[in-house]
Amino acid sequence: VNPIDKIISIANEKNILTLVDAAQSISHIPIDVKKLKCDFFVFSGHKIMGPTGVGILYGRSEILNNMEPFLGGGHMINDVNMDSFTYNSIPFKFEAGTPNIAQAIGLSEAINFYNQFNFDQMHNYLDSLYKYLIEILISIPNIKLYSNNINNGPVISFTIENLHAYDVAKLLDTYNICLRAGHHCAQPILNKYNLESINRVSLYYYNTFEEIDLLKKSLLKIIKILS
């Protein structure tokens, strides 16, 4: 987890605009954009148990007021005549056309659901779960972990020697285990380490220690099948 508050502070001293991509941290770290003093803050709805195809873009009002919309359409205008037009107020001037109504409502409900959790309790549980996951993965032959630092949050990537990540993910699916395989939107870093693809396990509050045991059992079977 990057020290984003320190990074923003340095950027602010040099009058550099900052945008925080919180897609991977929004459901694990309590965030106050006003305390961070970031200019923009974004995350995807499905990263916080919401619908796909919707997300949040926060921007400081003084910046948004001075920005020009990149897209025209209904609802983003205040007045139109034959010679000119005026924009609506923020945030509406950036929301041209019919909005993604159902997904926006779903995201709002997901955030309300998330806010019911006791964050400290959730953090402690995920911390224990993550430590157990690392312990289990290390015990499996021919697995290589890509950073097992506890400060990473409950997400870890790995490869299995001589096995393709997509094959591993496909077979895990037959055991009702879902994880990611591929570049994870980070192809340059994979290229740097000469990796074609990797598997990624992401834990959340609804996961259990028993499911991690099932992951180990399934991976051992897959290694035996594909070796």
Predicted regions and their residues:
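Pyridoxal 5′-phosphate
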Residues: 1-227
